[in-house]
């Protein structure tokens, strides 16, 4: 019942379905049962949750035995992460599957929405469920893979915006999965799709697994290419934003924007899940490496312009991985802070969504706008940073706008660079 699972449960309950959510965190469950949003930033969640909790249409528990037996459908939205060697770590997902399977009763549909390497639903989880439950897939229960395709902060809108992909282990199981999602979801009309928006059967779990990995890996590869263009543009004194704008003026070019980091639970992780099945995919691995190096590159640009960062006061603006979302998963802040520490800078971090104590929990000193600083590096595109001026950062000698969110007109007379801006001001 996290940032994806809770909105999903709320959406189902708002559609008239009886929903029980399971999570290992009792504090989160207590908040949900009390109608209190456990985490900020999800549009409409604070509005939708209270009446559902008070009516009992949605309730939360830490006990699988209180939720799984007799369920028509079980939707798994448990995190799958990568370890220090960038290999999929199935520990949490395996444990959740075992706990669920121990209470599974005949007739239930099990849908995995967590992004998985190709072949995992059929090769790992269907056999595991059979082993623990003693039931037989395709006879006593059905398993499908149906990837979540939503973005935190706008889950309710995204559920209606994008087709729901469903892949089963057999034809009848897939049909059942399609019927389930047609019953719990509704869709926006879109004339830009090759077929009507709605639930799209994929002909197998593997196709659905690959579709999710392919769409997210494409984004990482595209951003990696944009970042490569940006680094060359910096070296050549070219504004890459104008180049990309020109390229994208014809229909065959869709170059993404370069930036200081690619963060979040999805885009930095899912290429690794793809590579788990296709380790020879050199384009994918090269793009992932290029994107992972961008925080250090941004710091190196500052060091090159100033001669050295040794002893300088540097404020990193933005702990979150993206603007407006209180989440640090794979945020570029970690790479930026690490590179600054290696350069000998005095580092502090600012984020409008985090308190001083929350920043301190990461081991960072908090920076407050208005305090003296030598260098500022924008890492997250928070809306409040768009209006930043040198007056907000007294003494600033250089702004590295890693997200290109500030207005150049507000920085006239103070050195400001962007990723791929091709600018080399005198500091």
Predicted regions and their residues:
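Structural/interface elements that position substrates and couple domains in central-metabolism enzymes
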Residues: 1-427
